Swiss-Prot record:
InterPro entries, per the entry: ACT-like_dom_sf, ACT_dom, HD/PDEase_dom, HD_domain, NT_sf, PII_UdlTrfase/GS_AdlTrfase, Polymerase_NTP_transf_dom, UTase/UR
Protein name: Bifunctional uridylyltransferase/uridylyl-removing enzyme
Enzyme Commission no: 2.7.7.59, 3.1.4.-
Gene name of the record: glnD
Regulation: Uridylyltransferase (UTase) activity is inhibited by glutamine, while glutamine activates uridylyl-removing (UR) activity.
One of the protein's GO biological processes: regulation of nitrogen utilization
Alphabetized GO MF terms: [protein-PII] uridylyltransferase activity; phosphoric diester hydrolase activity
Cofactor: Mg(2+)
UniProt organism field: Xanthomonas oryzae pv. oryzae (strain KACC10331 / KXO85)
The family this protein is said to belong to: Belongs to the GlnD family.
Region (Uridylyl-removing): 333-691
Physiological role: Modifies, by uridylylation and deuridylylation, the PII regulatory proteins (GlnB and homologs), in response to the nitrogen status of the cell that GlnD senses through the glutamine level. Under low glutamine levels, catalyzes the conversion of the PII proteins and UTP to PII-UMP and PPi, while under higher glutamine levels, GlnD hydrolyzes PII-UMP to PII and UMP (deuridylylation). Thus, controls uridylylation state and activity of the PII proteins, and plays an important role in the regulation of nitrogen assimilation and metabolism.
Length: 869
């Protein structure tokens, strides 16, 4: 940088291009040196300071070249640059200070300066203001925030004093008002990110617990106490040495992530997007092992840093508030605790000492008083100081374990567990929970870290306990009152994923942990067995419902036999609903709700009638016809009409659908003659987006593929498809769909009309839409897997397809099946984040299972169509 010449100002721009051409490689070379030092592990605090210093020199040389010495103007770095920090792709924020006369006189000089800096490659963001204009602009606290961190680059003492006077607390934003504004800004910013840092692609600068939170604390400290950083508050008694050290350590951690992110993205990127996560993890030295991917280790460290920053920040914000508003008179709650300005505080300065029971007493009082705003900062710090000495449950005494179980049985148990988790107590009590805290899974299926997912599951259980009907969970409020001990479901929810990341089957490993915990807390053998079984089998109901044919009595028999009792079924159903809904906001839908409810009722009936003696096929057919007949009679249809419609429906239909579906199908068939096409659509559940589409048609080549392609083009995702052969060479197609894209309006009549129009034309002309793969999905590609087996009766071939999910996937598969002249009889569609796991039952065009050569040809065609490479 020192080689960039500092010439006398010249009103012409002659030579500026040469000057920029000399300066540009110097800046690039300086950045390359910093990158090398970054890779060698040099502290980020030094690297960002060195980059700011290099830019300082270039700025001063450019200023000297373009601005006359007697201009009356001064140059100041503001914002992050003002703090003396510049990350590789950060904006360079500057203020030119001068009165209006100087601004007008040197307007061309300033334009030349900024153009020159842009030519060099600096992303300059500038403001030109007089001191009075600075005072007016500082009415916006974001402007003031940038100005109070200013640093003179080319300025005399008078200019520095003028700027300081313009933004002095006596003129704009007194400290208390500034604190309130910054706190409101921080809370609003957190809300934009869902009030959590545990997102798949977190923002390490602006997200909760990010660098911006630390900068906000620094600005508050500067405005209120006149100190340059939070560490300086230690001497004033507002921050503990341990807190200051923790903030400094976590700031270095996040700053290293941000510095590396700017390098790998080669742009001012602040979000840890999937595009960069793996590359950044490798650059930072996080390696894969048998238990975790390197990227998962990196993200876990980030989430833990963000959580600790939030925890300490909450305490400091409260102390700043107390500094301005003063301490209120304590309101005694008894038991050694009081309310101070709405915050729960321990009365004793030595709390909790070495008494574990006092920590549990804190949470007991917190749960007992809904008016509590939170934990008092001094009590929170006292808790943090003794946290490392807080015992795990397996070495704690029996009284402490009894207190924990009492909290779990309390009316606000889930709130209490959330508080214990946020403050680090739950991870101390259950070390296995600490191990999964901040642990992410590098996929699109799990959108929360393991600990946050666990807490989401517990919140869903709390919703069931509220006793109010929730449209998302149609029967949960009916099942909940049957639970003998609700705390057992909470324990199962707490432990169901606790063994993630250890290698092996997390359900089996988690069951071992669960049993040890239950026995240590003196649960009965029966209760221990129930909770352990729930953890070990917590995926069973979800897998059965989504990957198997639950209209098949053999599937129901196997599932009911595994469950064994109505009590286990009730607990497992609620745990499954809470688990799926707590995995991703988009994962739970009306279709999954109905699917699990259907499995629950089918299993309950099997348990009631006895799993040893499942009803024979003829009995099931008779019951289904009788139930559907009763519904149609209630609608005014006579027996002759009902018999005629039933005769046109395949027997298999009565075994696959519920009575109300059968009645709807049969009533719809009244409108159509043999060899005609009928398309009907309706809402599968009232006041919900799920649609049921019924197509009755003469069997035609390409019918299934045309329907699937049309549904895809109209923005609907298919979750289940049933294709049955009906009398008179007709086909029964039933699809359960949900709007997938924003342009799918969810109108069943409009969708049915579109399908009628398509099916009235040439089906061979209907092709799948070509779609681009969304950016996120591109980072989770893998080779598709196609497996074949025979159906139980040997009449059909089963295909199990696992492939990277993408828009139009099923339409492409259906097109391949049509080209291969294959007939689809059943399809079950399941998507788990970036993975599509679909199953089909097919035959060749002569209704025979596929030969080995046909299987290989189909496998080759599907892989060629779906392979992401």
């Amino acid at each position: 940088m020192t080689d960039a010449p500092a010439e006398r100002p010249d009103p012409s721009v002659a030579g500026d291009a040469d000057w920029a051409a000399q300066a540009r490689p110097l800046l690039v070379h300086a950045d390359m040196r910093l990158r090398k030092r970054f890779d060698q592990g040099e502290p980020i605090e030094r690297l960002v300071a060195l980059r700011a210093r290099a830019v300082d020199q270039l700025m001063r040389n450019a200023w000297t070249r373009c601005i006359p010495a007697d201009s009356g103007l001064s140059l100041h770095a503001v914002g992050g640059y003002g703090r003396g920090e510049l990350f590789p792709r950060s904006d360079v924020d500057v203020l030119v200070l001068g009165d209006s006369v100087a601004q007008q006189r040197h307007e061309q000089h300033l334009s030349r300066l900024f153009a020159l800096l842009w030519d060099v490659g600096l992303p300059i963001s500038h403001a030109v203001r007089s001191p009075t204009q600075c005072m007016v602009a500082a009415a916006d606290q974001t402007v003031l925030t940038a100005l109070i961190e200013s640093r003179a680059l080319v300025a005399d003492a008078a200019a520095r004093a003028a700027l300081a006077a313009a933004i002095a607390p006596q003129r704009v934003w007194p400290p208390r008002d500034f604190f309130q504004a910054k706190r409101e800004e921080l809370l609003a910013r957190h809300q934009r990110f869902g009030d959590t840092a545990d997102n798949l692609e977190p923002d390490i600068k602006d997200g909760p617990g990010g660098l911006r939170d630390l900068q906000t604390l620094g600005c508050m400290a500067l405005r209120a106490f006149g100190v340059k950083d939070v560490e300086a508050l230690v001497g004033l008694g507002h921050v503990g040495c341990d807190e200051a050290a923790a903030l400094r350590r976590e700031r270095e951690e996040l700053a290293r992530l941000r510095f590396g992110l700017h390098i790998v993205a080669n742009r001012p990127e602040e979000r840890l997007r999937f595009d960069y996560q793996k590359t950044l993890a490798e650059r930072l030295g996080f390696a894969d092992d048998l238990e975790s991917l390197g990227v998962e280790k990196m993200m876990q460290r980030f989430y833990r840093s963000a959580a600790l920053i939030r925890r300490i920040s909450d305490r400091l914000l409260q102390r700043f508030e107390e500094q301005f508003d003063g301490e209120a008179t304590p309101e005694s709650l008894g038991g050694g605790f009081s309310l101070r300005r709405g915050y729960l505080a321990a009365d004793s300065d030595s709390w909790p000492g070495d008494d574990v029971l006092q920590v549990f007493a804190l949470f007991v009082h917190w749960a007992a008083h809904r008016e509590v705003r939170g934990l008092h900062s001094l009590t929170a710090r006292a808790l943090a100081e003794v946290l490392r000495e807080f015992p795990a449950y397996d070495v704690a005494d029996a009284t402490a374990r009894e207190l924990f179980m009492a909290l779990l049985r309390g009316t606000r148990a889930v709130e209490t567990l959330n508080r214990m988790a946020r403050l680090g107590v739950l991870g101390q009590w259950i070390p296995a929970f600490a191990s999964v805290s901040g642990r992410m899974q590098f996929d699109l299926f799990h959108v929360y870290t393991v600990d946050q997912h666990t807490l989401m599951v517990l919140r869903n259980i709390a919703l069931f306990a509220a006793g109010r009907a929730d449209e998302r969970f149609s029967i949960a409020h009916e099942v909940w009152p049957r639970l003998r001990k609700p705390e057992l479901l909470l324990l199962a929810g707490l432990f169901h994923d606790i063994a993630k990341g250890r290698g092996g089957d997390h359900s089996e490993l988690g069951a071992v942990d669960t049993r040890a915990f239950c026995l240590a807390h003196r649960l009965s053998e029966g209760d221990t067995e129930l909770v352990t079984w729930l953890v070990e089998q917590h995926l069973r109901m979800s897998v059965t419902a989504q990957k198997q044919d639950i209209s098949d009595p053999e599937v129901i028999h196997r599932f009911a036999t595994l469950v064994g009792t109505r009590e286990r079924l009730d607990y497992l159903y609620l745990l499954t609903c809470a688990d799926i809904a707590g995995t991703s906001p988009k994962l739970w839908n009306a279709w999954k709700d109905r699917l699990l409810a259907d499995l629950y009722f089918a299993a309950r009936r099997a348990l009631r009638e006895g799993v040893e003696h499942p009803p024979p096929r003829e009995e099931r057919l008779r019951e289904a016809r009788e139930s559907a007949r009763a519904l149609m009679q209630a609608q005014g249809h006579d027996d002759a009409t009902i018999d005629r419609q039933f005769a046109g429906m395949p027997d298999e239909n009565f075994l696959r659908f519920r009575p109300e579906q059968l009645a709807w199908q049969a009533a719809s068939l009244i409108e159509v003659e043999i060899a005609q096409t009928l398309v009907k659509a309706r809402r599968a559940v009232p006041d919900n987006d799920a649609l049921e589409v019924f197509v009755y048609s003469p069997d035609r080549d390409g019918l299934f593929a045309a329907i699937v392609a049309t549904l895809d083009r109209k923005g609907y995702g298919i979750h289940r498809a049933r294709v049955l052969d009906a009398p008179h060479d007709a086909i029964f197609d039933v699809f359960e769909v949900l709007p997938r894209d924003t342009y799918a309006d969810g109108d069943p009549q409009r969708l049915a009309a579109t399908l009628r129009q398509v099916l009235a034309g040439d089906l061979q002309q209907v092709r799948p839409a070509r779609r681009a793969v969304p950016g996120q999905l591109r980072h989770f590609r893998f080779a598709p897997r196609v497996e074949f087996s025979e159906s139980a009766d040997g009449r059909r071939t089963r295909i199990s397809l696992v492939a990277p999910d993408r828009p139009g996937l099923l339409a492409d598969v259906a097109h391949v099946l049509r080209v291969q002249h294959l007939r689809v009889h059943d399809a079950r569609i399941a998507t788990f984040g970036e993975r599509a796991e679909d199953q089909f039952q097919i035959t060749d065009e002569h209704d025979r299972p596929l030969s080995e050569s046909a299987r290989q040809a189909l496998r080759d065609a599907l892989c060629a169509c779906l392979d992401p490479v």
